[in-house]
Amino acid sequence: MSHGWGYADHNGPQKWCENFPIANGPRQSPIDIQTKGASYDDTLKPLKLKYDPTTSLDILNNGHSFQVTFADDNDSSMLTEGPISGKYRLKQFHFHWGASDGKGSEHTVDGKCYPAELHLVHWNTKYASFGEAANKPDGLAVVGVFLQIGEDNPKLQKILDAMDAIKSKGKQTSFTNFDPTCLLPKSLEYWTYPGSLTTPPLYESVTWIVCKQPISVSSEQMKKFRSLLFTAEEEKACCMVNNYRPPQPLKDRKVCASFK
């Protein structure tokens, strides 16, 4: 993005409203999910996620996170049902994480932070492209998955092995034959609410689907995330850590739960 936003004091979340006034809008993300305030909704369907590993293309350090991009020119990697109607295609996934294991997730649950959070970003195929869908109220659906410190997660290994090739901003390498289904928790019980992108331009276009059950990551694996750099090769190195936006006010929104 232009405007040079980031996560430092001079360009971080507290300053985003200067260039992106929607930062103070009515449906901003992330939020603190207060479990007592979330209402069970028996009309919410189970999530249906069908991903085709041949659609994964490449992995990129964009100077804010790293993302794995997918071919989205047909319906082979899709999210349907859950809280959404219609079909949403997978565009990319990325993570947010902290400088230490005590924080790093964007969403929190009853004030509890996790060390990292995975976001799988999908766009509504009633629009012609991701770009067209990105600012529409029903344009995007993002599945959020918390990472919790525990056992080494072998499912993350292929991603971690690619990190050395994308250490600095602007680096990209091919990343093929990957099925992100392997990154989902066993239980797909979720909370859902209307929200926004958590990075500029902060469009209020996201149906958030936050999985209740976290996946495992070891402290050693988290160190690999933190080995990436916010900076390009020729710049003074700055470690990619704390690339998360803090929780935003819930305002007039309701959080629904797919489970009792």
UniProtKB/Swiss-Prot annotation:
Main localisation: cytoplasm
GO cellular component, one term: cytoplasm
Catalytic center residues: 64 (proton donor/acceptor)
GO molecular function list: carbonate dehydratase activity; zinc ion binding
Keyword annotations of the record: Cytoplasm, Lyase, Metal-binding, Zinc
Record's subcellular location: Cytoplasm
Entry EC no(s): 4.2.1.1
Amino acids binding substrate: 198-199
Alpha-carbonic anhydrase domain ranges (all copies): 3-259
Annotated Zn(2+) binding sites: 94, 96, 119
Chemical reaction(s) catalysed: hydrogencarbonate + H(+) = CO2 + H2O
Enzyme superclass (EC): lyase
GO annotation terms (biological process): carbon dioxide transport; regulation of pH
UniProt cross-references to InterPro entries, sorted A to Z: CA_dom, CA_dom_sf, Carbonic_anhydrase_a-class, Carbonic_anhydrase_a-class_CS
Cofactor: Zn(2+)
One Pfam family here: Carb_anhydrase
Keyword Cell cycle: no
Residues flagged as site, Fine-tunes the proton-transfer properties of H-64: 7, 62
Family: Belongs to the alpha-carbonic anhydrase family.
Reported function: Catalyzes the reversible hydration of carbon dioxide.
Cited PANTHER family: CARBONIC ANHYDRASE, CARBONIC ANHYDRASE 2
Protein name (Swiss-Prot/TrEMBL): Carbonic anhydrase 2
Gene name per UniProt: ca2
